[in-house]
């Protein structure tokens, strides 16, 4: 008698971050596996391919949205904040949103349309949020504005986008993969001095000089740094001198800072944010409110300085002297919320 053919074993779902993005984990089908998604979130993790919006209640409470108003979401992303603001409009008024990511913005547009928020109440523009003045001029200004400056989890979780050092992928880091040059291309011709300055200015990297030397030496040898794994390995080798008890944690933080510095550079994030903050007062109607979420010291300092200057000049009637942070409960449920700071301002009447 012939042996019975063994069935292939089903891949056991552990509820953890997928090792390979392309594997069909339940996390990638949230509409079918709500219990699984809730389980992952309850553990303080973000399900793969999803983004959990941060400080939604605090933002909605501050913006004080009324039906009939006109609002602007500077960074559409997964659309969680946008949806919460749309719900407050109760079918009256209009929301405008911008995003430079053609891949994720199309998915979010479809997701929001299926939830009942179509083009009659929501206009999505594939452009940078520093063009807020152009949109404001068309519509007569905004009653409320939100700018969430964080990178969406969908981008981080997709290896093909090159945002994460945890998985192998092309070293890209562009928010819009169709515009500008990738991080790998940026490194191709960068000098040691320029790279050291970039790492220091964009992420306060304490090992900026050592890393800049190691990276540029590798490129000078003809070894292109084209993948996330390649860059991570160079960082690991550069910091191999560290004591064993500290090495793992320091390398992880250094990887985070290095990838952050490159992402800020290739997307011109500081230049875009500076331009946005300059145009923000003119885009708000008298009495209009703006809330901004920052995620690292560089952008937070820029936002704080701009709001304070606007208040002193009489442009804003009030602004946040201190930052508002996510609750301990939210940080426990969403680890990516821990570094978030919320600042706000009210346009003078």
Curated annotation (Swiss-Prot):
One of its GO terms (molecular function) is rRNA (cytosine-N4-)-methyltransferase activity. The keyword Coiled coil does not apply. Disulfide bonds: none annotated. Gene3D superfamilies: Putative methyltransferase TM0872, insert domain, Vaccinia Virus protein VP39. Its main location: cytoplasm. Keywords: Cytoplasm, Methyltransferase, rRNA processing, S-adenosyl-L-methionine, Transferase. S-adenosyl-L-methionine binds at residues 79-81, 99, 129, 148, 155. The keyword Methyltransferase applies. It comes from the Bacteria. Its EC number is 2.1.1.199. Pfam families: Methyltransf_5. GO terms for biological process: rRNA base methylation. It catalyses: cytidine(1402) in 16S rRNA + S-adenosyl-L-methionine = N(4)-methylcytidine(1402) in 16S rRNA + S-adenosyl-L-homocysteine + H(+). It is found in: Cytoplasm. One of its GO terms (cellular component) is cytoplasm. Belongs to the methyltransferase superfamily. RsmH family. Specifically methylates the N4 position of cytidine in position 1402 (C1402) of 16S rRNA. This is Ribosomal RNA small subunit methyltransferase H 1. The gene is rsmH1.
